[in-house]
Amino acid sequence: MKKLFVVLVVMPLIYGDNFPCSKLTNRTIGNQWNLIETFLLNYSSRLPPNSDVVLGDYFPTVQPWFNCIRNNSNDLYVTLENLKALYWDYATENITWNHRQRLNVVVNGYPYSITVTTTRNFNSAEGAIICICKGSPPTTTTESSLTCNWGSECRLNHKFPICPSNSEANCGNMLYGLQWFADEVVAYLHGASYRISFENQWSGTVTFGDMRATTLEVSGTLVDLWWFNPVYDVSYYRVNNKNGTTVVSNCTDQCASYVANVFTTQPGGFIPSDFSFNNWFLLTNSSTLVSGKLVTKQPLLVNCLWPVPSFEEAASTFCFEGAGFDQCNGAVLNNTVDVIRFNLNFTTNVQSGKGATVFSLNTTGGVTLEISCYTVSDSSFFSYGEIPFGVTDGPRYCYVHYNGTALKYLGTLPPSVKEIAISKWGHFYINGYNFFSTFPIDCISFNLTTGDSDVFWTIAYTSYTEALVQVENTAITKVTYCNSHVNNIKCSQITANLNNGFYPVSSSEVGLVNKSVVLLPSFYTHTIVNITIGLGMKRSGYGQPIASTLSNITLPMQDHNTDVYCIRSDQFSVYVHSTCKSALWDNIFKRNCTDVLDATAVIKTGTCPFSFDKLNNYLTFNKFCLSLSPVGANCKFDVAARTRTNEQVVRSLYVIYEEGDNIVGVPSDNSGVHDLSVLHLDSCTDYNIYGRTGVGIIRKTNRTLLSGLYYTSLSGDLLGFKNVSDGVIYSVTPCDVSAQAAVIDGTIVGAITSINSELLGLTHWTTTPNFYYYSIYNYTNDRTRGTAIDSNDVDCEPVITYSNIGVCKNGAFVFINVTHSDGDVQPISTGNVTIPTNFTISVQVEYIQVYTTPVSIDCSRYVCNGNPRCNKLLTQYVSACQTIEQALAMGARLENMEVDSMLFVSENALKLASVEAFNSSETLDPIYKEWPNIGGSWLEGLKYILPSHNSKRKYRSAIEDLLFDKVVTSGLGTVDEDYKRCTGGYDIADLVCAQYYNGIMVLPGVANADKMTMYTASLAGGITLGALGGGAVAIPFAVAVQARLNYVALQTDVLNKNQQILASAFNQAIGNITQSFGKVNDAIHXTSRGLATVAKALAKVQDVVXIQGQALSHLTVQLQNNFQAISSSISDIYNRLDELSADAQVDRLITGRLTALNAFVSQTLTRQAEVRASRQLAKDKVNECVRSQSQRFGFCGNGTHLFSLANAAPNGMIFFHTVLLPTAYETVTAWPGICASDGDRTFGLVVKDVQLTLFRNLDDKFYLTPRTMYQPRVATSSDFVQIEGCDVLFVNATVSDLPSIIPDYIDINQTVQDILENFRPNWTVPELTFDIFNATYLNLTGEIDDLEFRSEKLHNTTVELAILIDNINNTLVNLEWLNRIETYVKWPWYVWLLIGLVVIFCIPLLLFCCCSTGCCGCIGCLGSCCHSICSRRQFENYEPIEKVHVH
């Protein structure tokens, strides 16, 4: 049975009588004082056993507690300001259903605010709601609005019960509370706590709304329902739960200091996230970081934390091995102790006389070194040494002593000692700086002098762990352990708080793996090289150990010479033997080295591109010699003597070598005839294959390659090799590949990967056509795995998107489809106009890019290729990788939103946009069914542009098939089954795999081919909706196109045969264009080098598709660049050099590769900006050219626009503009207006429609005609507008004044003239040939001539193209002269004479006919003649047509 003790402190009254309530009760809670105790017990329940800690936070206090009683109006509220936290309670005394009232608590902030709304449903599981959202929250609410609709982008939207366990009996036993900080919000609700991390600004203003007192009285007073406890300052409570008893008490002495320095170790040895890290420093052996974030290995995993209130004046000993953890605060670990940290809590006052007199370090071998500091620079036995803790009153000079002799001067003690950390490897840190290094240390002891000080320490036995450390002013302020999947992402992104989004998963470190070696089988001979180093040690005049330069190096004898030794075998192994002799004051070294004179010989890298201790690690050479003389040497090793206090270089060992594969260093003798290859298949292995090193998975393939031993990618990575013994080809793939993790609210909810195996702790999975997706969402077995996910499978709203991929909060994966609309039925054209005399109908092609293929780059994978040491170096570049990855991600998200808003599909239009619907008249209105052969006989060529419904390629046209099937990509990693095939490893990886292995992941485009075809098909179908003024039903496509032809080119009395002439020309042009597409693409496919000289539209398509692949290929090739390092392979560098030297070389690779990545990102962002402008142009073309008819000449093709159709193309759309190109012109003299005079009055008349031109014909009469085509007619008064006078006023200005009048004025002629003048010396008139001209589509003849030499096949294709182009050009349409000009001409005399003769001749003939046939016959003849003369020809009426622009 736990015993509970509570000591509560009385807080001062905050508001007093000025508290803004109608009725105020300020009192201690009384018999409900246990609320605070219960709250603290719940709060501290996360503490491990044996914890004794002071909790400091904005906790609830005993006083003040207020009860606000309002009137019955629910639109009133109370406002409190400058709060840090708020707690409230529901009073249960004498409360019935009639007394229950709701409550709305609002905490205002920017951009996020908080609301907690409580209803009267106290027994409901969802009686209240908390919202943390962006927006302005209401101060009052209603029970029916228990939602978070007032805000957006909610961080928390959660309903909860008012009473724990949904029972009214449990009400009143729990406090509700809110705490808000700049980077976190903590909510305490129904016994549970919620911590939400995000950045926000809080005003400290809190409002209470909807609270009111009931009108019922209990014992003559109004009932107190809601009680509030505003908190303005930090409160401290001490919690001790040792020996199974939990005690909560008030902290009264040094509470703030205790909270700042003492914590309870969490299970696993972790330091609590809310610990302040007061006086904890970043340990470093080099420069000290002032401020910033970095991922590093630091001793931050606590095995035991010992809070020490004070020390006695006695010696204390602390050992790394066998330390007793009896006084630990919190969890205890049994890990190996790496560093013991002494954290000192002192005030700013001088603390002389309080500290340690000396630190004794018991090093390996039994030698004890002492560290102490003195107020004078010269130490002696008579001076007093100490290491004062806290602030010192003057400089202190520190030394290392052995047996009272100062061996080494360390430097000046910092003016304030806050932390001392000592590692078992012999490093002594003060305030994080490496003050001294020696041999490994077993134990530490020191004498303490604390006097009457009331200070306390903490002693932390720690181990090294990887963590993201935030440093401010050289001190640690926050630590995030890289101990979980989501924390690993935080570490890779160098941020403690992850925003919602996709993040590349950093490669996991490869631990101890088997070693695979592949060598050529041969007869091997082996040589053992034993090098003996004899060190000579003696003491200086002050007693310090000195290594003599007379130390000698002995090489094996070869050819009676011991100065040079060359390897003459196939293999060798090098071993070093070290001896140590000492002397007194002379140079006769006979004594054994003991105590501080004990030294060992080490061979350092020196100037060689490989380390001495890596020679036996399968390094290969053509020649290798060791020499004691520098003559002819390529490099040298430094031979040093390592003592307990320092290292001293005594000699040099020179190396003569040549790179190659004839000689190999091995760890042991393997002489004889055999294949020394050792392979570990189908598992992660550390390999050395024909001298190329790395880490990967080796798999056997079925591939057969006749030549080569090993095969590499453009980046230089090993992709496969051949075993020459049996000819088997093996593939080499990475142990792990990059993946994209979906993070929502700080939790990994899913991951995109090509590996079909569990990762990131995610067990549920599904597959897509492009990759595998693992998630927390439980995909049931009812789903047929291996089929593509459809967005309808999971009904949820995606929280994060990347390209066309979306992930919901529950981890479900959805594809983001285009927006669907109903498609309004609106007319698209109006009126009928006449046509020119002669013209050609032309179909012109234009390609516009709409979107790009998004690329995700795992920066650490690209730069380091999974090497753990390189990853540590990469963290020194702080946010370089984060900036690169976020730039690509944000660009992709921006494009996703823009393209998604652009593409929408009308289902009704989609059904009509097909060849089947085009050739059908079943849906025609009866008025149109009378027309014969309404379908393909008129515009049969449309079948190549309109989509065809089929099961495999729905909504794709014939031209789209050609474009998507025959456009050649250049090195672009496509998102298809290749990604899954890469990780199979049963074939040699291609470029796609090489990019994927190096962290380059090409994701599906925002709008893939199917979406684009649906969108363009919907555009085509939309033309058929109500094309002729809104009929009862939709009409086929052909009729809609006819309406547009009529609008531009036909009169109301045009003959049906002229429509057929137009349709025939169109059909011929489209048919030949379709064939040209196929032939041109065949030519491109045969030789992609000819892209620049083939048709313009196709060349642009080809360029758009290939440009990103070329950029990715170039980025991959950069991995082969060594950037002045000794190798482009990081594994090879670490295999050759010691860690310190290899770090310097790898740093060059990191800098170079980051530069390459930055260049790629800059190129990508620039390209996205260009595509953004291109996408806007495409939208304008769709609205003006496809959905309507353009009045702009040249915008929708070069001519008078008739109609346009759009087809999907790779990464964009291809437009087919049908235009009229005039071939004959009528020259007229235009008049701007008419000036008329009437006596003294003069006035002017100008044409009202600016599209009309007034001109005088040859008959001296005036006519009006449209400017776009010659259509003369007699003017009417409605065509003119009268103006007051005929005078024209001009503003006199100079050329220099024009910019002030017309800001965008540019004198084009003068500008061109200036350019020509500048380049006149080198400028000649170009020779332009006009013999080849194509007025209809494309001119490919001249370009094809440039391609003839490339291949005979391409030449044959050009012959066919020439024929097709001739057919295209033969689309000249000569229509009847339909323009009518009504004139009155006076006939000459000979015309009248001829008429008279005809009459005289015809009258006898007519009389003869009448007499011959009888009276009735004569009358009938006359009647028939009269009827024929008087009647007029009847033409079929056309309905009036209206024209609108559909936006």
Swiss-Prot record:
GO terms for biological process: endocytosis involved in viral entry into host cell; fusion of virus membrane with host endosome membrane; fusion of virus membrane with host plasma membrane; receptor-mediated virion attachment to host cell. Residues 1303-1400 are annotated as: Heptad repeat 2 (HR2). Pfam families: CoV_S1, CoV_S1_C, CoV_S2, CoV_S2_C. One of its GO terms (cellular component) is membrane. It is a single-pass type I membrane protein. Residues 775-1447 are annotated as: S2. Residues 655-799 are annotated as: Interaction with host ANPEP. Residues 1409-1447 are intravirion. It is found in: Virion membrane; Host endoplasmic reticulum-Golgi intermediate compartment membrane. A motif (KxHxx) lies at residues 1443-1447. Its main location: virion. The KxHxx motif seems to function as an ER retrieval signal. This is Spike glycoprotein.
